[in-house]
Amino acid sequence: MSDSAEKVKKIVVEHLGVEADKVTEEASFIDDLGADSLDIVELVMAFEEEFGVEIPDDAAEKIATVKDAIDYIEANKG
């Protein structure tokens, strides 16, 4: 697992208060991890801060799973 993937999973655990073993790459933030729209906004902000990437609203709307977040970050980080 990449360093980015580990950091994404850590952020998800901290922000959503879920067990680490539930945070799989296939896990949907809303359907599997119980996030609501405010949680998603907070996660996006945390990802932006941690990785130094900007995630525009149209891109954030397409990030539905943990893998989506990892893929976006790895494709766009400096």
UniProtKB/Swiss-Prot annotation:
List GO BP terms, alphabetically. lipid A biosynthetic process
Q: Name one GO molecular function term.
A: acyl carrier activity
Q: Which GO terms describe its cellular component?
A: cytosol; membrane
UniProt keywords (A-Z) are: Cytoplasm, Fatty acid biosynthesis, Fatty acid metabolism, Lipid biosynthesis, Lipid metabolism, Phosphopantetheine, Phosphoprotein
Record note on modification: 4'-phosphopantetheine is transferred from CoA to a specific serine of apo-ACP by AcpS. This modification is essential for activity because fatty acids are bound in thioester linkage to the sulfhydryl of the prosthetic group.
Q: What InterPro entries is this protein classified in?
A: ACP, ACP-like_sf, PP-bd_ACP, Ppantetheine_attach_site
Q: Which residues carry this modification: O-(pantetheine 4'-phosphoryl)serine?
A: S37
Cell compartment(s), UniProt: Cytoplasm
Q: Does the keyword Lipid biosynthesis apply?
A: yes
Start and end residues of each Carrier domain: 2-77
Keyword Magnesium part of the UniProt annotation: no
Q: Could you tell me which pathway this protein works in?
A: Lipid metabolism; fatty acid biosynthesis
In this record, what's one Pfam family?
A: PP-binding
> Which family does the similarity line name?
Belongs to the acyl carrier protein (ACP) family.
State what this protein does.
Carrier of the growing fatty acid chain in fatty acid biosynthesis.
Stated name of the protein: Acyl carrier protein
Naturally occurring in which organism (per UniProt): Sphingopyxis alaskensis (strain DSM 13593 / LMG 18877 / RB2256) (Sphingomonas alaskensis)
Give the gene name: acpP
